[in-house]
Amino acid sequence: KTLRVDYIFTGDARQQAIYLDELSQLPSWAGRQHHLSELPLEGNGQIIVKDLATKRCIYKTSFSSLFQEWLTTDEAKETAKGFENSFLLPYPKQPVEVEIVLYSPRREVMANYKHIVRPDDILIHKRGVSHVTPHRYMLQSGNEKECIDVAILAEGYTGKEMDLFYQDAQNACEDRKSVV
């Protein structure tokens, strides 16, 4: 399963904060299966998940956010804003401590936030099993342990143009297959 954690990054060029918005459970985990506690890439933010009882790191990932990019703009010197950010983590089997850290370009901590997630918490929303957005597989090369899915969104198409969208999406898949 997957734990979706929704945060709101807020602030301006002088001061930043992180707030927890919502937790959701999704039916399957399609992320990496090995080296979960190692950082695959350096970003300007990190999420660290630790077993609550042992404090051992069980998952770590990095990211770069639009909020941190926005902080470098002139607008951020004059006004504060909030940006929504969602992260997908392996669903914990035991209670965990989740820490999220935002870094400056000089790798100084700008903001951090810690919270505990208990897997049996009734406030964690179960999603992805009902009210699933209609979708079609245009090309399916294997299961999520072997392959990744690429989503093609119908942005810009009207409801009446869905047949055209699916035709264009199929053409894009065929073009991609010929490149591989």
In which residue ranges do the predicted regions lie?
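Fold-level signature of zinc-dependent metallopeptidase catalytic domains
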Residues: 123-180
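Beta-strand-enriched, solvent-exposed domains that form extended recognition/catalytic surfaces
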Residues: 1-124
